[in-house]
Amino acid sequence: MTDTIDPDLIERGRKMFAGDWHFIWASPSIETLPPMGSVEIAFAGRSNVGKSSLINALTGRNALARTSHTPGRTQELIFFEGPPNAGLRLVDMPGYGYAAASKAKVASWTSLIHHFLQGRATLARVYVLIDGRHGLKDVDLDILKTLDKAAVSYQIVLTKADQVKAAELAERVTATVAALAKHPAAFPEVLTTSSRTGAGMPELRAAMIRLLDERR
């Protein structure tokens, strides 16, 4: 709810994401990562959890990040950059947990993600997207352990909130917060969003503004 957040953060977030956001880089391997510069915020999640849709909703651009009905299609780290004065990049990470992917492909994705997480000094936070209809799964808990080990700050975002009854969503948030108590790198607040309705986007933008302020 936006009435619990500093209105200045909400407005600054709105302005920043109303600016020019564009694709700048795709990295299929650790050797092809772009030079470090701006603060980076990454989005991780199971295949088809809605990472690309969320990035599009954040920036108000329907086709900035490619969406796909084919799980596991995103096989690279995709970098987007905002207006010059924003000092921020968004990173769309490969989806995980797609059972039909080959073992070699899964190993390749896993290596790329692990090396990126452990060696990126400009990475301020990873938003781990969880399908709000289903909550945390074992494969999600595995990536949380990876983030804990890498000592990378992360926060859970429940997606597709418009497809869940309010009472059920509240229970899911409570259960997720309880689960995060076991994870030292986790930010203890859970966000809920809907890329279709735009719910939760002002709060997510404001959270990113707060992160940028902390980095300056």
Swiss-Prot record:
Organism per entry: Rhodopseudomonas palustris (strain TIE-1)
Cofactor(s) needed by this chain: Mg(2+)
Summary of the function given for this chain in its UniProt record: Necessary for normal cell division and for the maintenance of normal septation.
Pfam families (UniProt xref): MMR_HSR1
UniProt: GTP binding residues: 45-52, 72-76, 92-95, 159-162, 193-195
Protein's UniProt keywords contain DNA-binding: no
GO-annotated cellular components: cytosol
List of residues binding Mg(2+): S52, T74
Database matches in InterPro entries: G_ENGB_dom (IPR030393), GTP-bd (IPR006073), GTP-bd_ribosome_bio_YsxC (IPR019987), P-loop_NTPase (IPR027417)
Family per record: Belongs to the TRAFAC class TrmE-Era-EngA-EngB-Septin-like GTPase superfamily. EngB GTPase family.
A GO BP entry: division septum assembly
Molecular function as annotated in GO: GTP binding; metal ion binding
Entry-linked NCBIfam families: GTPase_YsxC
Start and end residues of each EngB-type G domain: 37-214
Top-rank taxon: Bacteria
PANTHER family: ENGB-TYPE G DOMAIN-CONTAINING PROTEIN, MSS1/TRME-RELATED GTP-BINDING PROTEIN
Statement: the UniProt record of this protein carries the keyword Disulfide bond: no
Keywords: Cell cycle, Cell division, GTP-binding, Magnesium, Metal-binding, Nucleotide-binding, Septation
Name recorded for this polypeptide: Probable GTP-binding protein EngB
